[in-house]
């Protein structure tokens, strides 16, 4: 079987929340994509509930694109501790961490309401009933209070 990078990561050594550059790949035509581990909670110590995670996913899909060009995808980990963020081009962990922090600040604000969450209607989402804006806001506040590091092993909070 092929080795999967994320299964090679020692999940007992990382210190969440953090943004970690997983790697960059160059396609056959020279296009570069960059993959990031955006870890919001400590692996095997906590997990974001599915409804909150789902609302964070939908909200961040728009909030991140408002702040940086070239985002391909922001997809949750099955373990519910964070997200893969895939970008066109080369980007640093610090650049992405700043975008994530700013996006979470907006999501956690009092002004951010259901009207700001995209894709929460039946025709737009495959599990539209499974959302929690309250949960998304509470997790965002917790993540921001802990600080987002640019290093997975040493706290270098932006």
UniProtKB/Swiss-Prot annotation:
Catalytic activity: S-(5-deoxy-D-ribos-5-yl)-L-homocysteine = (S)-4,5-dihydroxypentane-2,3-dione + L-homocysteine
Enzyme class: lyase
Keywords associated with the record: Autoinducer synthesis, Iron, Lyase, Metal-binding, Quorum sensing
Names of required cofactors: Fe cation
Sites where the protein binds Fe cation: 54, 58, 125
Biological process according to GO: quorum sensing
EC number of this enzyme: 4.4.1.21
Alphabetized Gene3D superfamilies for the sequence: S-ribosylhomocysteinase (LuxS) (3.30.1360.80)
GO molecular function: iron ion binding; S-ribosylhomocysteine lyase activity
Cofactor note: Binds 1 Fe cation per subunit.
Coiled coil ranges: none
Family note: Belongs to the LuxS family.
PANTHER family: S-RIBOSYLHOMOCYSTEINE LYASE
Summary of the function given for this chain in its UniProt record: Involved in the synthesis of autoinducer 2 (AI-2) which is secreted by bacteria and is used to communicate both the cell density and the metabolic potential of the environment. The regulation of gene expression in response to changes in cell density is called quorum sensing. Catalyzes the transformation of S-ribosylhomocysteine (RHC) to homocysteine (HC) and 4,5-dihydroxy-2,3-pentadione (DPD).
Assembly mode: Homodimer.
Protein name: S-ribosylhomocysteine lyase
